[in-house]
Amino acid sequence: MDRPVTKRITVLTLQNIYREKGKIAALTCYDATFAAVLENAGVDILLVGDSLGNVIQGQASTLPVTLDEMIYHVCCVERGTHSVFILADMPFGTFQVSPQEAFRNAVRLMAAGAQMVKVEGGRHMAETIEFLTCRGIPVCAHIGLIPQSVHQLGGYKIQGKTPDGARQLLEDALLLQKAGAAMLVMELIPAALGEEITRSLSIPTIGIGAGAVCSGQVLVLHDMLGISSGTLPRFVKNFMAGADSIQVAVRNYVKAVKTGEFPAHEHMF
């Protein structure tokens, strides 16, 4: 059933879902038309992701995406919605130089309509996250596979497979929570590690290839609809298969996340 138009979901709403042991359903979104469809289908969070570099611009990575481009797409998504929560990626190069520069750039994303910004990186981003949160900007941290560091990581590979790697990611998560992160995205890590981190934190975790115990799930919209070029990653399910409309496919995704049916074993590492 479509969600009736109501006041916008807030950080407190997401925290209440988390405290009540509910699941948070998120999808990427880049324009007003899809934003309205996803909102009406019951998605909780629209992530205006720098993945637009891949699926909208045809880039080989997210690295070329600029702040102005992110602001444009945040504005588009905000105009198409009334109640869904809007999370925006801080693109490569906009938050790494200094906390002060990160704040200036985050302010522009918030002014465009974002309710929270997402920052990729581990413990080295704790100072920046604390700086932002102390100045009124909610932050979602992002650990595991961080696409903006794909060259440093040597490609799109599972992270945290070794005991040392797993321990570092758990420590990173705890440090970022302590710094003030209100939410944590975990990407491409073993399901057992995703569960350990989720149970160790008191903030929601959103998984993408991080197992089923996370507080919620996110997928790239184009992947979930089966319209991305190339082979879909293992952690993706094509919800368009068997659905007679995009609206139905998205509703099926939301239901599968909320009931714990997705991700299934075949989508985990």
UniProtKB/Swiss-Prot annotation:
Q: Where in the cell is it found?
A: Cytoplasm
Q: How is the cofactor bound?
A: Binds 1 Mg(2+) ion per subunit.
Part of which pathway? Cofactor biosynthesis; (R)-pantothenate biosynthesis; (R)-pantoate from 3-methyl-2-oxobutanoate: step 1/2
Among the GO biological process terms of this entry, one is: pantothenate biosynthetic process
Q: Which residues bind Mg(2+)?
A: D50, D89, E120
Highest taxon of the lineage: Bacteria
Enzyme's top EC category: transferase
Q: Which UniProt keywords apply?
A: Cytoplasm, Magnesium, Metal-binding, Pantothenate biosynthesis, Transferase
Q: What is its EC number?
A: 2.1.2.11
As its record notes, the protein acts as a catalyst of: 3-methyl-2-oxobutanoate + (6R)-5,10-methylene-5,6,7,8-tetrahydrofolate + H2O = 2-dehydropantoate + (6S)-5,6,7,8-tetrahydrofolate
Q: Name one Pfam family in it.
A: Pantoate_transf
- Provide the GO MF annotations for this entry: 3-methyl-2-oxobutanoate hydroxymethyltransferase activity; magnesium ion binding
Name the cystine pairs: none
| Membership in a protein family | Belongs to the PanB family.
What is the official name of this protein in its record? 3-methyl-2-oxobutanoate hydroxymethyltransferase
What species was this sequence derived from? Answer: Nitrosomonas eutropha (strain DSM 101675 / C91 / Nm57)
**Lineage, please?**
Bacteria, Pseudomonadati, Pseudomonadota, Betaproteobacteria, Nitrosomonadales
> Gene behind this chain?
panB
